[in-house]
Curated annotation (Swiss-Prot):
It comes from Chlamydia trachomatis serovar L2 (strain ATCC VR-902B / DSM 19102 / 434/Bu). HAMAP family: Ribosomal_uL22_B. The lineage of its organism: Bacteria, Pseudomonadati, Chlamydiota, Chlamydiia, Chlamydiales. The keyword Hydrolase does not apply. This protein binds specifically to 23S rRNA; its binding is stimulated by other ribosomal proteins, e.g. L4, L17, and L20. It is important during the early stages of 50S assembly. It makes multiple contacts with different domains of the 23S rRNA in the assembled 50S subunit and ribosome. The globular domain of the protein is located near the polypeptide exit tunnel on the outside of the subunit, while an extended beta-hairpin is found that lines the wall of the exit tunnel in the center of the 70S ribosome. Keywords: Ribonucleoprotein, Ribosomal protein, RNA-binding, rRNA-binding. The gene is rplV. Disulfide bonds: none annotated. This is Large ribosomal subunit protein uL22.
Length: 111
């Protein structure tokens, strides 16, 4: 099993989980194709993390990418940047800029 992570990514976890659903339980070649045609910002971020996990597998254990599949995709919520928006009559409302931690684990089929 080979793991790659990206932390503090400026993508909402809820939207990133939608993109993560495109690559679950697929071979890495299929997952790369799905993410490369995805219009979502989270899809681009997940593709970079997937490419990193594939590179880890190829460089550390000399495993061919055709034998790899996506074992686990995890999207966790990171810290939120808090901003304020002015409202009427001198009030204000919070704006939460959400971040995500992305984790992709790949391995050989049958693990």
């Amino acid at each position: 099993m080979f793991k790659a992570t990206a932390r503090y990514i400026r993508v909402q976890p809820r939207k990133a989980r939608l993109a993560a659903g495109l690559m679950r339980n697929r071979s890495v070649v299929e997952a790369q194709q799905q993410l490369s045609f995805s219009q979502m910002k989270a899809g681009r971020c997940l593709k970079k993390v997937l490419d990193s996990a594939i590179a880890n597998a190829e460089s550390n254990e000399n495993i061919k990418r055709e034998n790899l599949c996506v074992l686990e995709v995890r999207v966790d919520a990171g810290p939120m940047f808090k901003r304020m928006k002015s409202k009427s009559r001198g009030g204000r409302a919070p704006i939460l800029k959400r971040t995500s931690h992305l984790t992709v684990i790949v391995g050989e089929r049958g693990q």
